[in-house]
Amino acid sequence: MKDYSKIGDKLVMQRPRRRLEGTAMGATVFDLRPGVGIGPFSIGMPICEAFAQIEQQPNIYDVVHVKYYDEDPLKLDVVISFPDHGFHLRFDPWSQRLRLVEIFDVKRLQMRYATSMIGGPSTLATFVAVYALFGPTFPGIYDKERGIYSLFYPGLSFEFPIPNQYTDCCHDGEAALPLEFPDGTTPVTCRVSIYDNSSDKKVGVGKLMDRASVPPLPPGSLYMEEVHVKPGKELYFTVGGQHMPFGASPQDVWTELGRPCGIHPKQVDQMVIHSASDPRPKTTICGDYFYNYFTRGLDILFDGETHKVKKFVLHTNYPGHADFNSYIKCNFVISAGADAAEANRSGNKITPSTNWDQVKEILGECGPAAIQTQGSTSNPFGSTYVYGYQNVAFEVMKNGHIATITLFQS
């Protein structure tokens, strides 16, 4: 992932500062869409689409932080943060889809709802202003421990800090907040949350934040389509119903999966030096070539002489790997044993969520790992480890999660 460097559990997008001298930070106006999103970012969008939006407008998004939990990337959200604009995007770690927009510094973000402005340095998002713009709603919830009052609309919530001297205006739990305090002041929004409004969940600060979930995918969506793997035989795509066997021709692949996103020649296999049975001279480029299906999390390798499929590479797209944001996550399922139904019942299946210790419990121990590294300049995340079984090789990150799976015929 060329455009990022790693600082702790944070990726920082590296690009020169492009903001023109004298340009106001608040000059950019983001459309506020309750239940839908903010600006170009929509609830439910894949993380790769969010990055595409960022790359298309580098003058606006010139400081971007990507935060994740390095030890267990499935435990916490992947967060894209825009510190200059005061908001961040929270992505569900499993589906890698946007579940929540959090505006944590409302004074930094100029928002437009319908034809009216709110937020930013010149338009305070006070309780009175919010009520006037969005209209009446049900009583909110007061969190006495945090001193925060949350006001809810469909797919949208506002948080207001309550000064200590006025906490008696609120009661813990559901409560109505007066438009003004006794001294004539009105509370000012400290945080805005935007989330899917297909359910009646109230999303706010603290534990309420965890209630935000991604909306269901439309029927027939290929995103996160389950791909069933029969090691040494084929891939089966469960939504489209395509079977992709080893030995298929490029024409077969085009017919079943469509035009590839990219085609490129394969570099010499660095692992072939360990094979005593391959006496061919080693060159930088071999005749083999890849079809890249980035939107499926899949690479297909063809033999340069026979033009038949010889390998499949499946990507998990975890942060902390050099290929992060190059592929959409491939939702593969590898069943241990011949009977897939029995594997489902027993739990003996390998998916992108399966860690390396669990793989060994299912498949048994294997030989020592080969270390794969690209150097700190091109890959700030360090080495990965490649373990081989019959017809399958696992590339494993230092945290024990699978980065890629390579399928071949022994």
Curated annotation (Swiss-Prot):
InterPro entries: PHAF1 (IPR005373), PHAF1/BROMI (IPR039156). It comes from the Eukaryota. It holds the Pfam family PHAF1. Belongs to the PHAF1 family. PANTHER family: PHAGOSOME ASSEMBLY FACTOR 1, UPF0183 PROTEIN. This is PHAF1 protein At3g51130. It comes from Arabidopsis thaliana.
